[in-house]
Amino acid sequence: MISENLGENQTEKIPLKGRTLKELSEIMITLGEKPFRAKQIYHGLYVNRYETWDQFTTFSKIFKEKLEELCSLTHLQVVKQLKSVDGTQKFTFTSESGNGKEFEAVWIPSGDGGRKTICISSQIGCTLNCKFCATAKLEFQGNLKAHEIVDQILQVEKIVGDKATNVVFMGMGEPLHNYFNVIRAASIFHDPDALNLGAKRITISTSGVVNGIRRFIENKEPYNFAISLNHPDPKGRLQIMDIEEKFSLPELLQAAKDFTRELKRRITFEYVMIPGVNMGFENANKLVKIAKSLDCKINVIPLNTEFFGWRRPTREEIAEFIALLEPAGVPILNRRSPGKDIFGACGMLASKS
């Protein structure tokens, strides 16, 4: 695995951030060093949050010079930081190389001092065209590397001076289109010797990449899993999510059922409410039937963008739709939209200020 992310060419320094302990051990051996050095670097990066070799005070000058020459501790640059009236903060990052490619992460405090969530990106832009999502309007510029995913959390926590209790892969991009780097980053978040977040506090979301879901099941990944459903009917879903062309709703629901059966864990369906598109009695009834067929919960999310003349549902419309879903007998959460005033709410990440 070492060679996968050495850089754009073999003359680049080896990035060490975003590496698992096993990978760091392999790198140290490749460099002619003892494997225990990997544990020291791993602890320094993820527990002490070191960003320069000078901070590794127990390392000899010769060893630090060697690391400086061959390896990098590259970290993200914050090019913009916006704070909402509700305490949510949005961070726009670019890589240390200064390539001009920007992506975003959002710090979402609960307000009561309890839950503190970081919503992170997995790609720069997105290849999919979910019509309610601002990120879909951006040019796709590639997958984020593991260290760019991990460092979103490290940099946000450093700036806000607090630690996240939860991490959600619900920012820019389709996480399962960057499976390797997303799972590697999640494993670092989960590792007790790194960020030490419980698996149930890490949520990976997908628009419905069925082969990625099956890979997730096969690998028995321990993390929470969410599917962006948004319509209970294949034809209706195709009108708002082009992924329906490749992975049909019946295929997706079968994968979801296999997930709950084989991993024995509940799955979350996310449902962006769009008046006149996917709400009303008929759609609610179909969604109830889906929910009754497997172990799930439903997160309903008011539309935050205004494409195609669509509008955000009123409180009354939201309450009415939720009431129609109650016969499903599953947990239903009306997810609030923090950070809407800074374009940091669900579906709004597009580097807009």
Curated annotation (Swiss-Prot):
UniProt-listed GO biological process terms: rRNA base methylation; tRNA methylation
Pfam families per record: Radical_SAM (PF04055), RlmN_N (PF21016)
Molecular functions (GO terms): 4 iron, 4 sulfur cluster binding; metal ion binding; rRNA (adenine(2503)-C2-)-methyltransferase activity; rRNA binding; tRNA (adenine(37)-C2)-methyltransferase activity; tRNA binding
Keywords of the record: 4Fe-4S, Cytoplasm, Disulfide bond, Iron, Iron-sulfur, Metal-binding, Methyltransferase, rRNA processing, S-adenosyl-L-methionine, Transferase, tRNA processing
PANTHER family, alphabetized: 23S RRNA METHYLTRANSFERASE, RADICAL SAM CORE DOMAIN-CONTAINING PROTEIN
Note: Reaction proceeds by a ping-pong mechanism involving intermediate methylation of a conserved cysteine residue.
Protein name as catalogued: Probable dual-specificity RNA methyltransferase RlmN
Organism: Leptospira interrogans serogroup Icterohaemorrhagiae serovar copenhageni (strain Fiocruz L1-130)
